[in-house]
UniProtKB/Swiss-Prot annotation:
The keyword Ribosomal protein does not apply. Accumulates harmlessly in the cytoplasmic membrane until it reaches a critical concentration that triggers the formation of nanometer-scale pores (pinholes) causing host cell membrane depolarization and endolysin refolding and release into the periplasmic space. Once the pinholin has permeabilized the host cell membrane, the SAR-endolysin is released into the periplasm and breaks down the peptidoglycan layer. Determines the precise timing of host cell lysis. Homomultimer. The chain crosses the membrane at residues 30-50. Its main location: host cell. It comes from Pseudomonas phage phiKMV. It is found in: Host cell inner membrane. One of its GO terms (molecular function) is pore-forming activity. This is Holin. Residues 1-29 are cytoplasmic.
Length: 66
């Protein structure tokens, strides 16, 4: 198995027996982790606020239905 390291480094991938594995820099990995954690945090906040929002909407409907 021979690897053309200059070409593969230029592409940013490592070819091992026909399987391409992406090589990411630590900054890219940190950015991806931050994005995932932010999405999880926002999702958790929405889940916790959803019952309050639904109660508020129901209360507004009751007030203005009369």
């Amino acid at each position: 198995m021979m690897l053309d390291t200059a070409t593969e480094a230029g592409k940013g991938t490592l070819a091992v027996t026909g399987v391409g594995i992406a090589v990411y820099s630590p900054y890219e990995i940190a950015s991806l982790c931050a994005a995932v954690l932010t999405a999880l945090y926002v999702g958790a906040q929405l889940i916790t606020l959803l019952p309050k929002m639904l109660d508020s909407i129901a209360e507004l409907r009751r007030r203005f239905k009369k």
